[in-house]
């Protein structure tokens, strides 16, 4: 080993993915409706879903990652794994909702899904029609 590489651990995540606190996050710029984006994530590997976000720290790391990925492009909203089921919001990976960052408390009734809002630097969420086509972020446990 070269001295500069001692103590450096190889990332368990694929090249170009974010490695954060035991999870891998991949950004996909091709725009899909929410259900197709979720299917894309599920097809990547077992346990992969549209990203669930459970803390402000995790949210900031993802927002920085998405901003870097979209650098030089027109910023666009990005799907995360939250969607409205009847009156409740639920994560696509089945995890409990312990954190939220909605841009406001007014929700439209109907078939809505959550996206990181481009105009906030991806630091707030917006409810968007699930049929809208957005870029998306996938997550799996490393």
Swiss-Prot record:
One of its GO terms (cellular component) is extracellular region. It holds the Pfam family Lectin_C. Residues 20-139 form the C-type lectin domain. Its main location: secreted. It is found in: Secreted, Extracellular space, Extracellular matrix. PANTHER family: MANNOSE, PHOSPHOLIPASE, LECTIN RECEPTOR RELATED. This is Dromaiocalcin-1. It comes from Dromaius novaehollandiae (Emu). The lineage of its organism: Eukaryota, Metazoa, Chordata, Craniata, Vertebrata.
């Amino acid at each position: 080993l070269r001295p500069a590489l001692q103590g450096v651990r190889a990332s368990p995540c694929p090249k170009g993915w974010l490695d954060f606190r035991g999870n891998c996050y991949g950004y996909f710029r091709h725009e899909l409706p929410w259900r197709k984006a979720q299917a894309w994530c599920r097809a990547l590997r077992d346990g992969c879903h549209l990203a669930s976000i459970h803390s402000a720290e995790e949210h900031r790391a993802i927002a920085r990652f998405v901003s870097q990925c979209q650098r030089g492009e027109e910023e666009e909203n990005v799907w995360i794994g939250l969607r409205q089921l009847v009156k409740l919001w639920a994560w696509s990976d089945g995890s409990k909702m312990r954190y939220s960052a909605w841009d406001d408390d007014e929700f439209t009734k109907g078939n809505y899904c959550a996206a990181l809002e481009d105009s906030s630097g991806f630091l707030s969420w917006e409810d968007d029609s699930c049929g809208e086509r957005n870029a998306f972020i996938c997550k799996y446990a490393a």
